[in-house]
């Protein structure tokens, strides 16, 4: 379940630190969060889709690692990001 181009551009515009920024942890976490949300909605309907459930767990793990990296690098950016995304922590 890939993100469409318009959604991706809007996320990039909101979370990018500079023009053309696609690799900063903030952007990566925001994109992963959107994919996780979409997959969660899919799994509410298709409860027995175990293949997608495994993909969801991999995405959550990748997001957790990026958040841990950001917390070690710059705690202020980390706190700002989780506040903007509405993540628990």
Curated annotation (Swiss-Prot):
CDD domains in UniProt: Ribosomal_S15p_S13e
Entry keywords, A to Z: Ribonucleoprotein, Ribosomal protein, RNA-binding, rRNA-binding
A Gene Ontology molecular function term of the record: rRNA binding
GO biological process, one term: translation
Gene Ontology CC annotations of this record: cytosolic small ribosomal subunit
Pfam families registered for this protein in UniProt: Ribosomal_S15
Family per record: Belongs to the universal ribosomal protein uS15 family.
Purpose of the protein: One of the primary rRNA binding proteins, it binds directly to 16S rRNA where it helps nucleate assembly of the platform of the 30S subunit by binding and bridging several RNA helices of the 16S rRNA.
Subunit structure: Part of the 30S ribosomal subunit. Forms a bridge to the 50S subunit in the 70S ribosome, contacting the 23S rRNA.
PANTHER family tied to this protein: RIBOSOMAL PROTEIN S15, BACTERIAL AND ORGANELLAR, SMALL RIBOSOMAL SUBUNIT PROTEIN US15M
Protein name: Small ribosomal subunit protein uS15
Species for this entry: Acidothermus cellulolyticus (strain ATCC 43068 / DSM 8971 / 11B)
Gene transcribed to yield this protein: rpsO
